[in-house]
Curated annotation (Swiss-Prot):
InterPro entries: B3_DNA-bd, DNA-bd_pseudobarrel_sf, REM16-like. Pfam families: B3. CDD domains: B3_DNA. It comes from the Eukaryota. GO terms for molecular function: DNA binding. The lineage of its organism: Eukaryota, Viridiplantae, Streptophyta, Embryophyta, Tracheophyta. This is B3 domain-containing protein Os03g0184500. One of its GO terms (cellular component) is nucleus. Keywords: DNA-binding, Nucleus, Transcription, Transcription regulation.
Length: 237
């Protein structure tokens, strides 16, 4: 680069231009431009070390062996066990599925909060009169306990303290000592299958209160307190 080109440049720009020109002269002297161009257009050949070996797997052909037969039956003709229906035979028809009986859903008149609290108060009073040797708790009935869902959750602390740590059959005794088996789900702390039968058989309704008394490791005595509707009449069955 001549001195004329350095006019109008700063000292830094002039030094940079001189460095670029010097590098160009060195590259021309070493013929680097032509070498890089030749490498760029040269065909690429794969390395033999990177080539994957193809594994040829021959399919094994196994000739089917004849069925094993005893010497006593070797000369007898082969028996074919094919199910052939006799001529004119008709297939058996399945009997139509019976319609599922509708589940009785207990209903009552309107129930006030005062009636619910009164039933719970009577249940707590009854519990206080029971033998303290047998643990117990009060359980007010809700809609999900006695209608369709029929899932009865039990107090967690009571379950963890007194009931089995695994699923078990828990028996419910009514006031006439009639037994009803239910499925106790330990991981959910509640009664599932069998509870619906007890609730429907005893006409439990939303708002009633119950007292569960554990008389045996997996047996409850159940006392029922009926709630009253707004007209003052107690629902009985």
């Amino acid at each position: 680069m001549g001195m004329g080109m350095e006019k109008g440049m700063t000292a830094y720009e002039a030094a940079r231009e001189r460095t670029v020109e010097e590098n160009k002269r060195k590259m021309e002297a070493l013929n680097l431009r032509h070498l890089s161009a030749a490498i760029a257009v040269a065909p690429k050949t794969p390395s033999p070390m990177k080539q994957k070996r193809r594994r040829i797997i021959e399919a094994a052909v196994v000739a089917p062996s004849p069925p094993r037969r005893s010497r006593r039956l070797a000369n007898l003709p082969e028996v074919k066990y094919a199910e052939v229906a006799p001529d004119g035979a008709e297939r058996m028809k399945r009997s139509p599925r019976k319609a599922i009986d509708s589940i009785y859903l207990a209903t009552r008149g309107s129930i006030s909060m005062e009636a619910r609290l009164e039933a719970a108060r009577k249940a707590e009073e009854l519990e206080s009169q029971l033998d303290p040797e047998f643990p117990s708790f009060v359980k007010p009935m809700l809609h999900s306990h006695v209608v369709r869902g029929f899932w009865l959750g039990l107090p967690r602390h009571f379950c963890e303290t007194y009931l089995p740590k695994h699923d078990a059959i828990v028996t419910l005794l009514d006031e006439k000592d009639e037994q009803f088996d239910t499925n106790y789900l330990a991981y959910k702390n509640g009664l599932s299958g069998g509870w619906a039968g007890f609730a429907l058989d005893h006409g439990l309704l939303d708002g009633d209160a119950t007292v569960f008394q554990l008389v045996k490791p997996t047996t409850f005595k159940v006392h029922i307190i009926r709630a009253t509707v707004d007209d003052g009449n107690e629902v009985t069955k």
